[in-house]
Amino acid sequence: VRSSAASDVYKRQEINNVFTQLVLVLADKGFISLDVEYIDGTKIESKANKYTFVWRKTVEKNRTRLLNKIRILLEQVDEAIIQENSVKDTSVELTPSMLSNIVDELKEVLEHQVTQDKEQKKALREKKKQVRELEGYRDKLMEYDNHLEVLGERNSYSKTDPDATFMRMKEDAMKNGQTKPGYNLQIGTENQFIIDFRLFPNPTDTLTLIPFFHSFQHRYNRLPGIGVADSGYGSEENYRFMQENGIEAFVKYNYFHKEQRPRYTPNPFHAESLHYNAGEDYYVCPMGQHMNRIGTRRDKTASGYITESARYKGQRCEGCPLRGSCFKARGNRIIEVNHRLNQYKRQARERLLSEEGIRHRGRRCIEPEAVFGQMKYNMAYRRFRHVGEDKVTMDFAFFAIAFNIKKMCARLRKAGKELITLAKSIFIGLFITCLLY
């Protein structure tokens, strides 16, 4: 007999399998090719109450205060009672299990203490009170540690839906930017059919692209030949992944739309506008002075990816007539340039401005956006009906299956084909593939 959690995982896998087989049947019948994937994300509200939040910063701050209270309390206890001197060392991390051992030792010592006069009895009562207080601190520390364990890499979660993260939703009736528990739903579409989906706890789209491609590969044992997404996915890590895995990236980057405006003129003082001598590795400032390389700065992203930015320093900036427009810091100007990211941006710009890129950019607006519009406004699917990632995944898998079947029937009806005959063959094929899986 399966436990409830194991049963949820099993059901999620089976429903996901049905969705995958339906998409494969659609590909077999010519509705889609699985060669191109239009990717976008939206936030769907959880069933959890919006006032059940747990914030990482609050937990960490209160936990630090609690540890200070515990150390002060331990210092107040008689040294003859404390057997473990290590707890006085601030470098030792106190844990609930360590506090439980200390409490047990204190109780054992206090049980065998003999009191003869009134003052000794009063002191004994005070020490027992401190032990009870220490027990309360131990339980509170255990609660904070449990919160941090549930949080993982996230900054918040909901008490009634621990898998949900608090995010700012597009549907903000009060217009005050209030956060609500929800999930970042990423979908991939082709010809307005949902071909892949996955839920993420982080609100930003940048960190979801690579895991989402892995989801596609897990479903279909291959990656799409073309990936199309908006500027929210345009990072160095994502561009590099697509290049190394043979995915032709039609992915915008920040300021791409701004660059395409007719009245756009680049700022001549920005690092991107300065002349760069690749052979000798130096920049030329607007006054013609060389900016020589002085080092490299390395940064780690939230996903652990290391980016490298070359640093260049100007010469004789003091007294320069263009200094006020060029920069306002003291000393000589220093710029930082990520050459690898700039190269990826140039490649992306060439693709996006090509004839094929213009076609994909036009289709992206009517691919996932159309699905989200149908889902949220025509079908009123703005909030999940269940709690927990497994059940929520099943929830959307059912929706995606129904959505694809509805879209398929509409296409058949529009094409004037014999709907019943072809639909029967599709469902029979789907049934057989699910049995053989």
Predicted regions: what they are:
Residues 1-6, 10, 437:
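Single conserved hydrophobic/aromatic residue that forms the stacking wall/gate
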Residues 7-244, 253-254, 311-312, 321-324, ...:
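Polybasic low-complexity intrinsically disordered regions
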Residues 38-43, 230-236, 258-260, 333-340, ...:
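A glycine-rich phosphate-binding loop feature that marks nucleotide/adenosyl-phosphate handling sites
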Residues 25, 69, 73-76, 109, ...:
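Residues that form generic nucleotide/phosphate-binding pockets
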Residues 201, 206-207, 319, 358-436:
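Basic, amphipathic alpha-helical segments enriched in Lys/Arg and hydrophobic/aromatic residues
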Residues 78, 243-390, 397:
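Helix-centered, glycine/charged polyanion-binding patches within enzymatic domains
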Residues 2, 188-189, 277:
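Hydrophobic alpha-helical segments, especially N-terminal targeting/anchoring helices
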Residues 47-50, 237, 284, 376, ...:
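Active-site-proximal flexible loops/turns
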